[in-house]
Amino acid sequence: MSENKFLPICKDDMIERGWEQCDFVLVTADAYIDHHSFGTAIISRVLENAGYKVGIIAQPDWKSVDDFKKLGRPRLGFLVNGGNMDPMVNHYTVSKKLRKKDLYTPKGEMGKRPDRATIVYCNKIREAYKDVNIVIGGIEASLRRFAHYDYWDNKVRKSILVDSGADLLVYGMSEKQIVEVADFLNQGFDGKYIRHIPGTCYIADSLDEIYEEHIVLPSFKEVSSDKRTYAECFKIQYDEQDPVRGRTLVQEHNGKYVVINKPEMPLSREELDRVYALPYQKTYHPIYEKDGGIAAIEEVKFSIVSSRGCSGNCSFCAITFHQGRIVTSRSEDSIVEEAEEITKYDDFKGYIHDIGGPTANFRKPACKKQLTLGACKHKRCMSPGICKNMEVDHREYLHLLRRVRKLPGIKKVFIRSGLRYDYIMADKDDTFFKELVEHHVSGQLKVAPEHVSPNVLKYMGKPAGKTYDEFRRKFFRITERLGKKQFIIPYLMSSHPGCKLEDAIMLAEYLRDINYQPEQVQDFYPTPGTLSTTMFYTGLDPLTMEEVYIPRSKEEKAMQRALLQFKNPKNYNIVYDALVKVGREDLIGNGPKCLIRDKNSFGKGNNHSNHKSGGRKSRNENSGRRESEDKKRSSHSKKQRGNKSRGFDQKSQRSSKGKKRR
């Protein structure tokens, strides 16, 4: 592949194109991958399509200004993003330990991007070119546009627009607003005076400079000094996060005013088709070949993005604050054309890995009202149950999948991005479910029930546990009829706000009853921009302002995590301590309902648990299970659940992330 098909990354590339100067230089914390799953590729190609000359500086050395000068001063300004993932999440685990690999960097090498990359890069650009326009965007900037709790510093930080010193922030997917910003810059406007565009943020010196209808939020000083005020502030942000009915929000930061304009409308189907038809090279830049390429491309190379936005609104997911609740999708023809293109790749083996998005089986707005009235302000589409106005329909998605799997050269089309199983169960037509199981499962179907405790599910904004039970039973019935050996891999989360040890034990009992042990368990990770993170920081549910239990200590987090893997001998002591701590010694012993054996039996040649932990059955929900999987929990468990439900019935539901856990 010729290097000149990529956008310029050095002066020689500019000379080859006959450019004396770039209009924009885009600085990113990721390696340069020209694929539409990466924001750098989309924004640069959209601007190129609008007639602008864009150069790329990927993973510059931030210890000097030299790399920031290698394409020269751009005519209109610098664009800066922190990569496809918040740099702090990219660097650190939930326990704040440094990760071993960076999949967006050659050789997976750590240390090629700084913490808080957007801020660091902007400071270096200012050092190189003092008065140049700087526009920031991407996931890091989008989710940190307000004063926000930062888990890694364990404090409230200012809006990233203030800390970075940038002139303008574009949030969300940003294709519309970045072109409009570019056009105004091209007309001679300074970036800091471009103030009317939806989906952007700017800084005003006084409230008199703000002409739009707006709401003044509690100031940075107020939210950083009082947790109740922080929660109340988040509730306003949450309610106004809508492109139709949302209003401009204003937050004072030390005498200046961060102005967050209402969100931009999502792209129409025709606009999405044009964006995804731009001349992406669909791979990493050739300069990385000597290092073995970039691992991040492997997950998306044979996958197709079909939609944006999510109606699920899970409390721990940032999609609502980034892509929004209104779902839009590409046309069938656009997706089929991309699938045909993929079949021509030299290394394509006949398998499309995914056709999906934040939620694969969402293709349209939840109801007809959303595009004219916006998403509902005081209720969610799918929690605690599916709204009566939600249009549940898989026909278009099913027709799309059929078209793609019939293409010459395609052996299988898999679905690996999130599927909402409650949406599948709400569809009165079983055709999609049957064809999903028959044609689109690569041996294992990954879904995200996350928990079974009604109390925890309520705070997560997830469907009731019985919905997942119904789904898995139906999945196994269809699988058995087809004569297949397929499994379900449920994603589970420990230590979410509202989750007590009793709730974790309830989940452990459920796993015991279905004879399943997860290989990995995800602790709740408080990331910027989510409802759950606000609960974690404040101990309050912003939607009700009632107190929420937060598992904070390392000891309790370890107990909750170990309970989900109670069959692992390494976890015996901590599971034992957890059960004793809450008076559940009835689960210690030799009975069929016990999670672990007593200490007199453990270590004397006997298995530490009454439940086998080896083999595939312990890692997957086996399609061969019968009635034993579906037995009711012990009477003690039922009593526990009943008590929990009654104790929390006044608390309202929460909303959503993801990274693609649906």
UniProtKB/Swiss-Prot annotation:
Keyword Transmembrane helix: no
GO MF term (any one): catalytic activity
Domain of life: Bacteria
4Fe-4S keyword on record: yes
Necessary cofactors: [4Fe-4S] cluster
Any single Pfam family the record assigns to this protein: DUF3362
Compositionally biased intervals (Basic and acidic residues): 618-632
Domain Radical SAM core: 296-567
Region (Disordered): 596-662
UniProtKB keywords: 4Fe-4S, Iron, Iron-sulfur, Metal-binding, S-adenosyl-L-methionine
Cofactor note: Binds 1 [4Fe-4S] cluster. The cluster is coordinated with 3 cysteines and an exchangeable S-adenosyl-L-methionine.
Amino-acid positions noted as binding [4Fe-4S] cluster in the UniProt annotation, renumbered to this chain: 310, 314, 317
Residue ranges, compositional bias (Basic residues): 633-644
Xref: HAMAP family: UPF0313
Similarity comment text for this entry: Belongs to the UPF0313 family.
Protein name: UPF0313 protein CPF_1407
Organism: Clostridium perfringens (strain ATCC 13124 / DSM 756 / JCM 1290 / NCIMB 6125 / NCTC 8237 / Type A)
